[in-house]
From Swiss-Prot:
This is Adenylyl cyclase-associated protein 2. Residues 298-320 have a biased composition (Low complexity). It is linked to Cardiomyopathy, dilated, 2I: A form of dilated cardiomyopathy, a disorder characterized by ventricular dilation and impaired systolic function, resulting in congestive heart failure and arrhythmia. Patients are at risk of premature death. CMD2I is an autosomal recessive, severe form characterized by onset in infancy or childhood. The gene is CAP2. It is found in: Cell membrane. The modification N-acetylalanine is found at A2. The modification Phosphoserine is found at S301, S309.
């Protein structure tokens, strides 16, 4: 009889839920009601972002799937990052601007997606699509525009410019051989162009928050971020769940009924249930035994033993990589070399390039003539080479010394602290291009020795009545 009564009550609850769901499904699409002070529905700014995803992002994803491999995998990550941004914009359209202390936590889902994209590039430096991965990795921080004020649009443009450095390389390699890569470049750059236009129309001076909803917080906002309608890319929100999940849950409750019946049987014993308890003596009581209190202070809570797991993915930077010195296609890869001063590349060809990555306290000699040399993320590295027909680039490095034995037309220094370049007599017409770097010196041969000339790091700019005039600031020793 009791089981029958319980079944009737469950059926009544199920019917009640079905009626409420049916009533909600017939509401007008523009206004889906109000929950906890938040009016559901999609704001015009979110709808506009959905159009961007359905057009530009979808086109980029399609072209990436055509190229497949690492490019496709990377593009899926980009798509996921845009989904996270869409969820954040949905939250902003329903909640007021959060307190400053909550901003970092609310931005964490997007920042983690950006980090994932950049990490993928770092882990696949040997990929033959490395320029594609670099274009995405260098520009994906543009999604951080939601935290930029008062001019988020120019920030996105700056990130777009960072991408063009690598997309130009892609175009150079494939514009005459495989137009699929050209389409890929166009579709990717179009994303950021359209995002700038979107920001200009809906968030000109910074992210626009709701004026009427409750204040966003790590509690209330995450309920929106984790809800079904806010995450998928298509514009229309998903309808409320139908009856099948309801009865699935009921079925799961029935599966657990034996254990629940056993629990009720124990409870029905009343005071007799205490007969199974064991008597605790004074030496087993913490408040009467000082030694137990000392042990208790050292005992960790079992619930805390699982907390380190979320941080475990961050352990990968400490991995020890095997040193690499090999020719892969037309690229010489010199990676993860430490305390090596005997590295020599002698069998070179004009079309080959050398890529030197994450090398420390080492010296590398490249003989013959190569197309270009790139030094990336290196420390205390010495490079000696004969001839380069293209460019020598130094990026994100520290304490680099370069000696030119023959000729090189251009040397580029970017985001580097400490770079000393020894030019030969034949390389005095070399052009040095530098940006965001310091402690740069050019050493010119004179009378059998070298004379050092610092590259300016400080500039002064003045208005001459018609244009800006910029020149190095003279610093007298």
């Amino acid at each position: 009889m009791a089981n029958m009564q319980g079944l009737v009550e469950r059926l009544e609850r199920a019917v009640s839920r079905l009626e409420s769901l049916s009533a909600e499904s017939h509401r007008p699409p523009g206004n889906c009601g109000e929950v906890n002070g938040v009016i559901a529905g999609v704001a015009p700014s979110v709808e506009a972002f959905d159009k961007l995803m359905d057009s530009m992002v979808a086109e980029f994803l399609k072209n990436s799937r055509i190229l497949a491999g690492d490019v496709e995998t990377h593009a899926e990550m980009v798509h996921s990052a845009f989904q996270a941004q869409r969820a954040f914009l949905l939250m902003a359209s329903q909640y007021q601007q959060p307190h400053e202390n909550d901003v970092a936590a609310l931005l964490k889902p997007i920042s983690e997606k950006i980090q994932e994209i950049q990490t993928f590039r770092e882990r696949n430096r040997g990929s033959n699509m490395f320029n594609h991965l670099s274009a995405v990795s260098e520009s994906i921080p543009a999604l951080g525009w939601i935290a930029v004020s008062p001019k988020p649009g120019p920030y996105v443009k700056e990130m777009n410019d960072a991408a063009t450095f690598y997309t130009n390389r892609v175009l150079k390699d494939y514009k005459h051989s495989d137009l699929r890569h050209v389409d890929w470049v166009k579709s990717y750059l179009n994303i950021w162009s359209e995002l700038q236009a979107y920001i200009k129309e809906h968030h000109t001076t910074g992210l626009t928050w709701s004026k009427t909803g409750p204040v966003a917080s790590t509690v209330s906002a995450f309920s929106v971020l984790s809800s079904g309608p806010g995450l998928p890319p298509p514009p229309p929100p998903l309808p409320p769940p139908g009856p099948p999940p309801l009865f699935e849950n009921e079925g799961k409750k029935e599966e657990s009924s034996p254990s629940r019946s056993a629990l009720f049987a124990q409870l029905n014993q009343g005071e007799a249930i205490t007969k199974g308890l064991r008597h605790v003596t004074d030496d087993q009581k913490t408040y009467k035994n000082p030694s137990l209190r000392a042990q208790g202070g050292q005992t960790q809570s079992p619930t805390k033993s699982h907390t380190p797991s979320p941080t475990s993915p961050k352990s990968y930077p400490s991995q020890k990589h095997a040193p690499v010195l090999e020719l892969e296609g037309k690229k010489w890869r010199v990676e993860y070399q430490e305390d090596r001063n005997d590295l020599v590349i002698s069998e070179t060809e004009l079309k080959q390039v050398a890529y030197i990555f994450k090398c420390e306290k080492s010296t590398i000699q490249i003989k013959g003539k190569v197309n270009s040399i790139i030094i990336d993320n290196c420390k205390k590295l010495g490079l000696v080479f004969d001839n380069v027909v293209g460019i020598v680039e130094v990026i994100n490095s520290q304490d680099i010394q370069i000696q030119v034995m023959g000729r090189v037309p251009t040397i580029s220094i970017n985001k580097t602290e400490g770079c000393h370049i020894y030019l030969s007599e034949d390389a005095l017409d070399c052009e040095i291009v530098s940006a965001k770097s310091s402690e740069m010196n050019i050493l010119i041969p004179q009378d059998g020795d070298y004379r050092e000339f610092p590259i300016p790091e400080q500039f002064k700019t003045a208005w001459d009545g018609s244009k800006l005039i910029t020149e190095p600031a003279e610093i007298m020793a």
